[in-house]
Structures are given as structure tokens and as C-alpha cells.
């Protein structure tokens, strides 16, 4: 789908030497590297991730700071989210998502006896998330901030945070979101465009209306692989944030339904693996699997919702499907860690302790 959704934009780009296979080749290389790093991650014992989780998270914060440094961070489409490594633009926020899962899992276990208190259990983690969010909003990357917040707060709740504190947080969340939206005019424009996309189809709602037209043209069975019209440079970011719209146009409701079912199965299976870890008395492994499940689940829901016009545009990719070097690499490492957790669960069930 990366090739199908990017073939026109790459074939017509002088900067890409009019190579229609540009994005396909790069994504294939990223996937190959992802398999290598994923295999390495699979070989690493889970207790090692827990041991170095705080160091990894601090390293992630340092990378978020470096993104903001002129000459280090690279600005694309008005956002400074990348660090240029000559052959690849590295996006630290993707790495921070994984590090947040590790750190929050370790934090919950270290603070297990204090998780039901506000001062010692909740506030320290809240302060860390606020700091992370501040750095992300300076880029700005509201989508990554949303995902990381859900991961951290979700793991705190699963780790024993009281219902009173959790639902109090849910009460104040809309107020914070409203403030963040009104803080930047472009976010307010996105909300206005989302509420009535056909009021300004050539302006604020251009991306959304073309996404909806793609789904409409696909109908039930789609127009066929490679037959999308919207990917012909009508729909911006067709190979990244809006790849689901291209899938909807080429494979119809049937294709989109299959994608949704596969994502649901993946997330449910991750939580199933977490349940097995709990039964094997491996709380860190359980929290890691739950955290990665939350990450893939919330990012998938937001991306699909944006494509379908259910949420305002966020700038989030669809895990495992959208084009993006850092994204696919980190996604594959995360999947490898979940496979490692499942592998250890099966060994324990057979009586082979690792």
C-alpha cells in the first residue's frame, strides 16, 4: 500500500529523480532494518529493559530537546520533529513512545505501594508527562503528546491508580485540551474544519474532504489496487497519515473492515499476552504488553478516526502500515518485545524458566 499510495508523487518529483519506486525501496530498507533491530530486541532479556528504562526515557527527553536546537532539528511542513542523520530523518517522538511504555511500567512497579496516593504515586508521573508534553508541543506534535499521555495514564490506571484520581483526571482533560487547542490558531482551524468540512473544502477542510471522497469512491469493494484517484496528489500525505483513505478507495468498506479487525485482533492479543504474564507472576512483562497494546490501539483509533472524519486532523501515522522510517522501525521493535514476552510465557508454562 505504501507503493500504491506514493507512486504518483514519487514519479512526478524531480527531487526524487522521478523514481516511482522511491518510497517502496526506502520502506523496504526500513523494514529490513526493523527485522534486524527487532531480532536484537527479542534476544534481550526483559529484566534488562526494566533496569535501563529510566536511562532510556531520559535519553528520549534529551533527543526531544535536540530536535528544538537550530541546525540539529529539521523543520518539515512547519513542524520541527526530525533530526537529520544524512540518509534518514529520525523522529525522536516515535522512540519516546516506546521508552514511555518501559519507564511507566517500571515506575508503576517501583511505586506499587504508593500508587493509590496523589503526592507520591500520581504527581511525580504527571510532572514527567507534563515535561514531555511541553517539549512535544514546542515542535509542535500534539498527536504524539496525546498518544504518550494515554500510554502513561493508562499504565498508571492498570498499575493501581485509584478510580477517584483517574476519573478526576478525565474531568480535567477536556479543559486542558480546550486550552491547548485555543493556544494555536491552526489547531482551532482544524476543529472548525472538522465540525463542518464542506463549509471550506478548499481551505481548512481540504485534506478531510478528499479523504471522505476517497472512502465514498471506494464504496463496498473498492476501485481496485492501484486505481485510486485521490492519491494522484489530490489527497495530501496519502502515503503517511491518510493511507487508510487510499485503502478505502482501492479496497472499499471490505478492505477497511479487514484492517480494523486485524488491528483489533493485534491489540486484544497483546492484552491476552499481558494476562498470561500476570498468571506467570511477571508484572513488568504484563505492563509492557499492555502499554504497547494501548499505544497501537489509541494511535490506530485516532488515525482511522481522522481518516473517517470522526476526529480532527492530528498528524499521526497508522502503525505498521503508513510510510515512515522511524515509525516502522520502532513499531517492529515493539512487536518483537511483545513476541519475547509471549515466548517467555510459553517457556514458563512448559516449566522452562529463563
Where are these regions (language model features)?
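Hydrophobic alpha-helical transmembrane segments of polytopic
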Residues: 26, 53-63, 151, 258, ...
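Hydrophobic alpha-helical segments of membrane proteins
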Residues: 138, 146, 222, 257-261, ...
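Membrane-helix boundary/helix-loop-helix interface segments in multi-pass membrane proteins
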Residues: 1-3, 7-139, 304-319, 323, ...
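Hydrophobic transmembrane alpha-helices and their immediate junctions
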Residues: 254-298
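Hydrophobic alpha-helical segments of polytopic membrane proteins
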Residues: 54-61, 122-135, 142-182
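Alpha-helical transmembrane segments of polytopic integral membrane proteins
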Residues: 34, 38, 101, 105, ...
Amino acid at each position: 500500500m505504501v507503493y500504491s499510495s506514493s507512486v504518483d508523487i514519487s514519479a512526478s518529483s524531480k527531487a526524487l529523480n522521478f523514481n516511482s519506486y522511491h518510497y517502496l525501496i526506502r520502506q523496504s530498507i526500513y523494514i529490513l532494518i526493523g527485522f534486524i533491530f527487532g531480532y536484537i530486541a527479542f534476544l534481550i532479556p526483559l529484566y534488562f529493559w526494566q533496569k535501563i528504562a529510566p536511562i532510556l526515557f531520559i535519553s528520549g527527553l534529551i533527543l526531544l530537546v535536540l530536535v528544538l536546537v537550530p541546525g540539529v532539528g529539521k523543520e518539515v511542513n512547519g513542524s520541527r520533529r526530525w533530526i537529520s542523520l544524512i540518509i534518514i530523518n529520525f523522529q525522536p517522538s516515535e522512540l519516546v513512545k516506546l521508552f514511555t511504555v518501559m519507564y511507566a511500567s517500571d515506575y508503576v512497579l517501583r511505586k506499587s505501594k504508593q500508587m493509590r496516593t496523589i503526592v507520591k504515586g500520581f504527581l511525580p508521573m504527571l510532572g514527567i508527562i507534563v515535561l514531555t508534553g511541553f517539549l512535544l508541543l514546542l515542535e509542535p506534535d500534539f498527536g504524539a503528546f496525546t498518544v504518550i499521555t494515554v500510554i502513561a495514564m493508562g499504565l498508571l490506571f492498570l498499575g493501581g491508580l485509584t478510580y477517584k484520581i483517574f476519573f478526576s483526571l478525565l474531568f480535567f482533560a477536556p479543559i486542558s485540551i480546550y486550552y491547548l487547542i485555543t493556544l494555536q490558531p491552526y489547531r482551532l482551524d482544524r476543529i472548525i474544519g472538522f465540525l463542518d468540512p464542506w463549509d471550506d473544502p478548499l481551505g481548512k477542510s481540504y485534506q478531510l474532504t478528499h479523504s471522505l471522497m476517497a472512502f465514498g469512491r471506494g464504496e463496498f469493494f473498492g476501485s481496485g489496487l492501484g486505481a485510486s484517484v485521490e492519491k494522484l496528489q489530490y489527497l495530501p500525505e496519502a502515503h503517511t497519515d491518510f493511507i487508510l483513505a487510499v485503502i478505502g478507495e482501492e479496497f472499499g468498506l471490505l478492505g477497511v473492515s479487514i484492517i480494523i479487525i486485524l488491528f483489533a485482533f493485534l491489540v486484544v492479543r497483546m492484552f491476552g499476552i499481558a494476562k498470561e504474564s500476570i498468571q506467570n507472576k511477571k508484572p513488568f512483562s504484563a505492563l509492557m504488553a499492555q502499554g504497547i497494546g494501548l499505544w497501537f490501539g489509541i494511535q490506530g483509533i485516532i488515525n482511522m478516526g481522522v481518516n473517517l472524519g470522526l476526529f480532527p486532523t492530528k498528524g499521526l501515522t497508522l502503525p505498521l502500515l503508513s510510510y515512515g522510517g522511524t515509525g516502522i522501525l520502532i513499531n517492529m521493535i515493539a512487536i518483537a518485545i511483545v513476541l519475547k514476552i509471549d515466548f517467555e510465557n510459553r517457556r514458563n508454562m512448559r516449566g522452562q524458566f529463563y
